[in-house]
Amino acid sequence: MTYFVLFLGLCFVLGGLAVASNPSPYYGVVGLVLASVAGCGWLLSLGVSFVSLVLFMVYLGGMLVVFVYSVSLAADPFPEAWGDWGVVGYGVGFVVVLVAGLIVGGSIGSLDFGVVTVDSVGMFSVRLDFGGVAMFYSCGVGMLLVAGWGLLLTLFVVLELVRGLSRGAIRAV
């Protein structure tokens, strides 16, 4: 279980690195999805399964909407890939800065690889915290409705902003 949590942490850092050095929106969304899956898996291993599920749904839903709009606004005929030298240079530079920060901060020698999960037994150590669902919908229903209306308004604003001169954003092919 410790190695699994460390692997999720490594995937989270690599996903953030992929987002930071993304050459185009086509490839940046891969890093976002990797980072969100790894982060939610990390939360799941620590025992907060409901929060992990909600964050996973919000992150993936929001990221897919942002991905669609950024691809529609920045459609490049020849997008750069991760194998190009400029992108590899950014990635190597970010890793060098990360390692230098760890060395300067003195954290490189004191890294403790002991990860404690909820029960510290087995791979499926998920606490039953689904009592938060009832609290979320009973006490937070007002904010949930306000957030839903805000997201709907944002959707219509973005659709209005990206439409062409004579055609809307949703075109018939």
Swiss-Prot record:
Q: What is the membrane topology here?
A: Multi-pass membrane protein
Show the InterPro entries listed in the entry. Answer: ComplexI_Subunit6, NADH_UbQ/plastoQ_OxRdtase_su6, Nuo/plastoQ_OxRdtase_6_NuoJ
Keyword Cytoplasm listed? The answer is no
Keyword tags: Electron transport, Membrane, Mitochondrion, NAD, Respiratory chain, Translocase, Transmembrane, Transmembrane helix, Transport, Ubiquinone
Tell me, in one coarse class, where this protein mainly resides: mitochondrion
Keyword match Electron transport: yes
Recorded superkingdom: Eukaryota
Q: Which GO terms describe its cellular component?
A: mitochondrial membrane
Task: Report the catalytic activity.
Answer: a ubiquinone + NADH + 5 H(+)(in) = a ubiquinol + NAD(+) + 4 H(+)(out)
EC class of this enzyme?
translocase
One family name in Pfam for this protein: Oxidored_q3
What does the UniProt record say this protein does? Core subunit of the mitochondrial membrane respiratory chain NADH dehydrogenase (Complex I) that is believed to belong to the minimal assembly required for catalysis. Complex I functions in the transfer of electrons from NADH to the respiratory chain. The immediate electron acceptor for the enzyme is believed to be ubiquinone.
Q: What is this protein called?
A: NADH-ubiquinone oxidoreductase chain 6
Its gene is MT-ND6
